[in-house]
Amino acid sequence: MPKIVVVGAVAGGATCASQIRRLDKESDIIIFEKDRDMSFANCALPYVIGEVVEDRKYALAYTPEKFYDRKQITVKTYHEVIAINDERQTVSVLNRKTNEQFEESYDKLILSPGASANSLGFESDITFTLRNLEDTDAIEQFIKANQVDKVLVVGAGYVSLEVLENLYKRGLHPTLIHRSDKINKLMDADMNQPILDELDKREIPYRLNEEIVAINGNEITFKSGRVEHYDMIIEGVGTHPNSKFIESSNIKLDRKGFIPVNDKLETNVPNIYAIGDIATSHYRHVDLPASVPLAWGAHRAASIVAEQIAGNDTIEFKGFLGNNIVKFFDYTFASVGVKPNELKQFDYKMVEVTQGAHANYYPGNSPLHLRVYYDTSNRQILRAAAVGKEGVDKRIDVLSMAMMNQLTVDELTEFEVAYAPPYSHPKDLINMIGYKAK
């Protein structure tokens, strides 16, 4: 009976194991997870802190016991894979509770160890990062135990923005700092102004081009020379792949520690796959490498690997489109396609339109700004971005499908919109992009 070992039990690993079991009732499947919890919703964590998700239990899909009862898959939490011997097809495992080490053999190995939050490196009792439910619980307990009021949020990516909004809605007083003036980097820089407007509207302090120099108790010294006091600091300064344990194997890593995979999600070593935040692949619509550490890619890759292991080698990963979205107070920001700094590799043109998200005469209308970049050589869409209070997700998802099917910008005129006054226009913003590009 084949033995399948999975490293990591969150989005990619647990989903892949579950899909394998759906297709294969016989194989022995075991998952090693270095942390306390499995199958939790990373994306829910800021909303747990903000009490939008009323109970943290809703962010936890399975316990190991429930997973085994439902699927006959063994999950061992607090078990960290610390080395891979790909020649012998074994992994070395550390039981983090007992410090016992042992080896586990495998016929197929699936790597989904995810990523860890970067830290600023200060030794302080008031600094926290947010990456898993343990972090969430620690933040929650600290807030309650210390009657936290003033919170410093460091970083301006989507996690930091979500955390800040949820702290504010919880009734706390957050301040945002970021080391540069480039915020929410997945968006076009000039489309991010509503982020600052939303902060200003609520009188939430923020400083760009600012960094922490020292932390002494609750006293924070900044690069600008300011000295301020905070009850708590939450750091959102990026992540790094959990690939240290892979370095001793023959598995190829890129210079950032990610694992390049082929379209079957295979590494360069036979019988070893990589999925989720650890893996890097390519775009679907253009010939460029891509790393997109978001939930969709982990779930899609999990299903493909399950099919591959079950014997269906016709299903392959066709690449990322990089579709992403974030809510910040009243606004939604979304983009799809190559990143802004990758556009320079193309001869491109940009076309944009700003108009109401639905019919102007219908109540509650607000502007939606939609922008599309296209390749001048074949007129295919390279990237799209949108910002507004409503209708952003619909337009970006439609453009994602257009890019998936390699439509030209001109073909957007043919998009047949589901029109009624509360939802759109007879000629939607997407249609208008096509007309303006002609």
From Swiss-Prot:
GO terms for molecular function: CoA-disulfide reductase (NADPH) activity; flavin adenine dinucleotide binding; NADP binding; protein disulfide isomerase activity. SUPFAM superfamilies: FAD/NAD(P)-binding domain (SSF51905), FAD/NAD-linked reductases, dimerisation (C-terminal) domain (SSF55424). Substrate binds at residues 15, 19, 22, 39, 42, 71, 299, 427. The active site is at residue 43. Its EC number is 1.8.1.14. Signal peptide: none annotated. Binds 1 FAD per subunit. Belongs to the class-III pyridine nucleotide-disulfide oxidoreductase family. Homodimer. This is Coenzyme A disulfide reductase.
